[in-house]
Curated annotation (Swiss-Prot):
The N-terminal domain interacts with the head of the 30S subunit; the C-terminal domain interacts with the body and contacts protein S4. The interaction surface between S4 and S5 is involved in control of translational fidelity. InterPro entries: Ribosomal_Su5_D2-typ_SF (IPR020568), Ribosomal_uS5 (IPR000851), Ribosomal_uS5_bac-type (IPR005712), Ribosomal_uS5_C (IPR005324), Ribosomal_uS5_N (IPR013810), Ribosomal_uS5_N_CS (IPR018192), Ribsml_uS5_D2-typ_fold_subgr (IPR014721). GO terms for molecular function: rRNA binding; structural constituent of ribosome. GO terms for cellular component: small ribosomal subunit. GO terms for biological process: translation. This is Small ribosomal subunit protein uS5. Keywords: Ribonucleoprotein, Ribosomal protein, RNA-binding, rRNA-binding. It comes from Clostridium novyi (strain NT). Part of the 30S ribosomal subunit. Contacts proteins S4 and S8. With S4 and S12 plays an important role in translational accuracy. Located at the back of the 30S subunit body where it stabilizes the conformation of the head with respect to the body.
Amino acid sequence: MRIDPSTLNLKEKVVFINRVAKVVKGGRNFRFSALVVVGDENGHVGVGMGKAVEIPEAIRKGIEDAKKHLVEVAMVDTTVPHAIQGEFGRGRVLIMPATEGTGVIAGGPVRAVLELAGLKDVRAKSLGSNNPKNMVGATINGLSRLRTAEQIAKLRGKSVEEILG
């Protein structure tokens, strides 16, 4: 099920800009790639990559791409329902719930994704690759696989009390 970005009030954040060079006979041709995260700070977040000769154009393309890849994040108040490990390439991110008032404890690219998803109290630990693209991808992977107790109970045809014990 695709999420319609036009119905959401999306904010964007540029996580990483990379300059790449193609060496040709006449010298070097430079291009830029931009890794962009968009989110409504209310349970929807997406990530996109844009490439172009100019930085603003790369960012614009990244935002467009991110809007096409929005995911819904299961939340319990201001945190995640349970701990989960997301994986993308060799990047692994462990996302853990935190008590109210803790804030977002996460490094660099992971923090941008968690904040734009609308999580206020969450802890995250980056394991494996610290490449921004892999870290952001792993975070999105983890967040998209989160399920609340109500969702699991509905899937299994049981009550929430039976699931939680």
